[in-house]
């Protein structure tokens, strides 16, 4: 039986190359590289300890996370559509590739997989959001809060940009006096009675606007001057606070950062977002303007789509819910 026994593979021996005293720069560089390769081969011959194995896996995992953060911050991100506010342009359960480069790449905004927000810097982009663009953005927070309680990405259509005047009359949207048509796959029920409700819930507070009859309102542009008085300062209270300033009324004067003021100079550009499913969308009509700095990117295409409400324990139903007709569908 011994004649069939495999011979144990003998380990090769390696010796490091000595650097001659009179070697030039290129020779030294080549020898350094060869010695580095030899050291790697010697290292592979030695069996790893448990601690070394754990350290190797840790380095690989950390490296993968860093690569994901760089790609996610600079180029392409993934976004899962959580609600039907943009139906039928996108559907609940669509998984989207998002182009982040177009509006300006940024350093990572969250820790991957756990969604913990990070301080980030945004670089200049190819263009700013335009009317008609579908945008992914960091939710700026509810109407009456300075900062959102949790970090969330939202998806809406930009219907007006900085300096535009927007008005909704009987569900029809007008920008600078011209009707903004319902997008190709958008939804709206013109036969449904015009809704007088929720005038206390819309933005700005106290204006009495409704979902279906709204404005006119100017979308703030950097360096705009907003005139303030005792009647309207509440309308702009949280807008000004979100820009990082304190505003109060002492019974006589309006105070911004403790100093009397009758006007406020806008510090950023903003846009106005609405869902294509206009009757069933929580959007800028309710919580206000979207800072350009919050706009992350624009969706490119659907790379996967299924019912995200079904648990993985119901794998059969989950797989049967795959919408093959939506995969590889471009978004516009």
Question: At which residue positions do the language-model features occur?
Answer:
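Alpha-helical transmembrane signal-anchor/signal-peptide segments
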Residues: 77-95
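Hydrophobic membrane-insertion alpha-helices, especially the h-region
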Residues: 56-75
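Soluble "head" domains of membrane/secretory-pathway proteins
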Residues: 2-53, 89-332
């Amino acid at each position: 039986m011994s004649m069939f026994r495999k011979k144990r593979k003998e380990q090769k021996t390696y010796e490091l190359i000595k650097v001659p005293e009179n070697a030039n720069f290129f020779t030294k560089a080549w020898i350094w590289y060869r010695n580095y390769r030899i050291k790697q081969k010697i290292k592979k011959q030695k069996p790893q300890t448990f601690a070394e194995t754990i350290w190797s896996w840790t380095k690989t995992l950390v490296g993968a996370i860093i690569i994901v953060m760089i790609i996610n911050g600079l180029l392409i991100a993934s976004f899962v559509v959580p609600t039907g506010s943009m139906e039928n342009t996108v559907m609940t359960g669509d998984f989207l590739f998002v182009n982040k480069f177009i509006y300006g790449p940024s350093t990572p905004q969250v820790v991957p997989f756990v969604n913990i927000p990070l301080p980030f810097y945004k670089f200049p982009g190819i263009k700013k959001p335009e009317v008609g663009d579908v945008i992914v953005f960091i939710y700026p927070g509810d109407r009456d809060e300075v900062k959102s309680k949790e970090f969330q990405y939202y998806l809406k259509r930009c219907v007006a940009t900085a300096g535009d005047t927007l008005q909704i009359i009987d569900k029809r949207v007008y920008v600078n006096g011209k009707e903004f048509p319902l997008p190709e796959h958008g939804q709206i029920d013109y036969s449904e009675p015009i809704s007088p409700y929720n005038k206390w819930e819309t933005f700005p507070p106290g204006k009495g606007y409704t979902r279906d009859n709204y404005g006119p309102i100017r979308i703030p542009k950097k360096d705009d001057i907003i005139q303030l008085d005792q009647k309207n300062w509440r309308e702009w209270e949280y807008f000004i606070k979100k820009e990082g300033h304190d505003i109060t009324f002492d019974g006589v004067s309006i105070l911004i950062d403790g100093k009397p003021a009758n006007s406020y100079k806008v510090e950023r550009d903003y846009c106005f977002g609405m869902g294509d499913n206009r009757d069933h969308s929580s959007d800028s009509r309710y919580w206000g303007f979207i800072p350009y700095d919050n706009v992350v990117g624009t969706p490119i295409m659907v790379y996967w789509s299924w019912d995200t409400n079904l648990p993985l324990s119901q794998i059969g139903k989950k797989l049967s819910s795959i919408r093959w007709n939506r995969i590889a569908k471009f978004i516009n």
